[in-house]
A protein has these predicted regions:
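Class I S-adenosyl-L-methionine-dependent methyltransferase catalytic core
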Residues: 1-219
Length: 219
């Protein structure tokens, strides 16, 4: 689904997914085109919320996803005590207007600075894992100053631009989805081909030998 500000660009969704630890519950309170939700390995429970009815209508019938038409900030506030360490919230809200080229409005449901401030306050109350995407802004930098931050380049309609990804957890030692491991396309391809070679090599072994190796690796 094409969507302004979507995260489907080369190197963008991979960067975000490579920062996601294992989780049982996955929530996108600003669903939009859902590029990350569609690209990542599903969690046991997947929830997408959007205030724009035209967006949620396009998601009607999506399998394995609870799609909700509503206010994502209010949803998180209501679910605050139910979201534990096994949940991951990925927030990709409409970016702060002052950070955009010519302050262009792109969405049917934009957010004021006051709404961004409310979102930041709610996110800091959550006990679960949280990721937040956005252009750099003083508001986000101040509110999330104690969170981990990585920066990456994304292609926009106006050309390449640096984006930020804030997280309230340390660099993950384990990932929810390993398919995009690697810092760039070349490294991802190297790892993918290496994995295929190892799979083929192990698959060619006699049954008992193969099981012995897999058992040793699983320890």
């Amino acid at each position: 689904m094409s969507y302004p500000g979507g995260k489907g660009g080369a190197g963008v969704f991979q960067t975000i997914i490579n920062q996601q630890p294992p989780h049982a519950v996955y929530i996108e309170p600003f669903l939009g085109g859902g590029s990350i939700l569609l690209a990542k390995r599903p969690a046991s429970t997947n929830v997408g919320i959007d205030a724009d009815r035209s967006v949620t209508d396009k998601w009607s019938g999506a399998r394995g996803v609870d799609v909700i038409w509503g206010n994502g900030i209010s949803y998180l506030q209501k679910q605050r005590d139910r979201l534990g360490p096994d949940a991951l919230v990925y927030c990709d809200p409409p970016y702060v207007l002052s950070t955009r080229d010519r302050d262009r409005r792109l969405y049917n449901c934009e957010m004021s600075d006051a709404q961004h401030a409310r979102l930041l306050a709610v996110l800091q109350e959550l006990r679960c894992m949280v990721q937040v995407s956005g252009y750099y802004s003083a508001m986000y930098a101040k509110a999330l100053s104690k969170w981990r931050l990585i920066r990456y380049m994304a292609m926009t309609r106006g050309g390449l631009r640096e984006e930020c990804l804030w997280m309230n957890y340390p660099q993950p030692e384990l990932l929810h989805d390993y398919r995009y491991l690697g810092d760039d396309y070349r490294e991802r391809e190297r790892i993918r081909r290496k994995a295929l070679r190892w799979v083929a090599r192990i698959a060619s072994l006699p049954e008992l030998e193969r099981r012995a190796i897999l058992s040793a690796v699983a320890v």
